[in-house]
Amino acid sequence: MAYSATQTKKGYQAGVKDYRLTYYTPDYTPKDTDVLACFRVTPQPGVPPEEAGAAVAAESSTGTWTTVWTDLLTDLDRYKGRCYDIEPVPGEENQYFCFVAYPLDLFEEGSVTNMLTSIVGNVFGFKALKALRLEDVRIPVAYLKTFQGPPHGIQVERDKLNKYGRPLLGCTIKPKLGLSAKNYGRAVYEALRGGLDFTKDDENINSQPFQRWRDRYLFVMEAVHKAQAETGEIKGHYLNVTAPTCEEMFKRAEFAKEIGAPIIMHDYLTAGFTANTSLAKWCRDNGILLHIHRAMHAVIDRQKNHGIHFRVLAKCLRMSGGDHLHAGTVVGKLEGDRAITMGFVDLMRENYVEADRSRGIFFTQDWASMPGVMPVASGGIHVWHMPALVEIFGDDAVLQFGGGTLGHPWGNAPGATANRVALEACIQARNEGRDLAREGNEIIREAAKWSPELAAACELWKEIKFEFKPVDTL
């Protein structure tokens, strides 16, 4: 027997009904296996928060705008997302934290791509909402165990480099575009020879007419090997393998491996999570470290009421795979409140992180022994920032000075030496029990007395400050 769209069958009534009748379940207790999400929801005028939260749960899981008879062909209660709690956002009008629980069966194993497609893929354009932001997610251990995670992790990287007890030092080669491959390699050599551990391609240097990737790789690795031989330290350069296609990306990665590169680089947001996960698995299989740049992140995470918070993007990267990830500086030119920044830094590198609203962490996260990601502090930092950077980030971080190395009045190598001396002075002072937060400037001045390179850097950048209030606050 055929039925029209308006006829009633057993258990089915066609038409449109409020989302909250099905997807708002305040009595629900989340399971240990649920993926949990916290959304900041701004409803349109006249839309109750319960309806808005339920709409988010519905449109990011099993729901659509009208009742469909095929709901009868599945167990909707088993598969639907549930808005189980709603809280007003403190200090904000008509904004609510809506907490949604998703059954684990909604997501493909080991796929950040699928997880994000479900949770944020469609609902952000929903007309009933003025704005929507994904603030945090809780990934259950049962789902985490389907991901490889970082190719190597912090401890394996330290063992590969034979460097312990201090942050690593890096430098982004500037100008980021326009140098020939040979001159680029020269800058790499000078910075590594001066005392840095790493140098780096910038995010947008791929394979342009002025510098094709193969030429850059060859000149750079010649510089790396020469600096290693002269200093006796293991050195590296982040060779950017981001490419127009995955096939080309792997071609570049294979060539980097052939010429002895210990580390390569990838722009994970612009290239996509599928490409990144594939590259991370290749890096583990081939013993290559993977540096991750977050180019394009601020397009997604900068607005306070719409988008995806970087702590979510950082969690997704740890699952997808990367050994380093840019994470802001707190003290440099880029956005970064200290409490919030350290919240997602801990989520990158610690094994277990308790919920802490003061740091923007809405859920306790157990990483189930997944290797950690080393945060990279980069953007407008120089020698005067060194004490604060060491005090804030501790040992397991990469402190990356681009202009703060290459902008030294005496050149690249003295700039690198100034940073290395400043770092070693801060580590020694800390290990002797001195307070870097209170005595930082004095520690740098003392070291500058016997290091002319550091003294010149201190004089050049003594007046440089970036005093803007962060946008990303609680």
Curated annotation (Swiss-Prot):
Its EC number is 4.1.1.39. Its cofactor is Mg(2+). The keyword DNA repair does not apply. Keywords: Bacterial microcompartment, Calvin cycle, Carbon dioxide fixation, Carboxysome, Disulfide bond, Lyase, Magnesium, Metal-binding, Monooxygenase, Oxidoreductase, Photorespiration, Photosynthesis. GO terms for biological process: photorespiration; reductive pentose-phosphate cycle. It catalyses: 2 (2R)-3-phosphoglycerate + 2 H(+) = D-ribulose 1,5-bisphosphate + CO2 + H2O; D-ribulose 1,5-bisphosphate + O2 = 2-phosphoglycolate + (2R)-3-phosphoglycerate + 2 H(+). Substrate binds at residues 122, 172, 176, 294, 326, 378. GO terms for cellular component: carboxysome. Pfam families: RuBisCO_large, RuBisCO_large_N. The active site is at residues 174, 293. Mg(2+) binds at residues 200, 202-203. PROSITE patterns: RUBISCO_LARGE. Gene3D superfamilies: Ribulose bisphosphate carboxylase, large subunit, C-terminal domain, RuBisCO large subunit, N-terminal domain. Heterohexadecamer of 8 large chains and 8 small chains; disulfide-linked. The disulfide link is formed within the large subunit homodimers. NCBIfam families: PRK04208.1. Belongs to the RuBisCO large chain family. Type I subfamily. The basic functional RuBisCO is composed of a large chain homodimer in a 'head-to-tail' conformation. In form I RuBisCO this homodimer is arranged in a barrel-like tetramer with the small subunits forming a tetrameric 'cap' on each end of the 'barrel'. This is Ribulose bisphosphate carboxylase large chain.
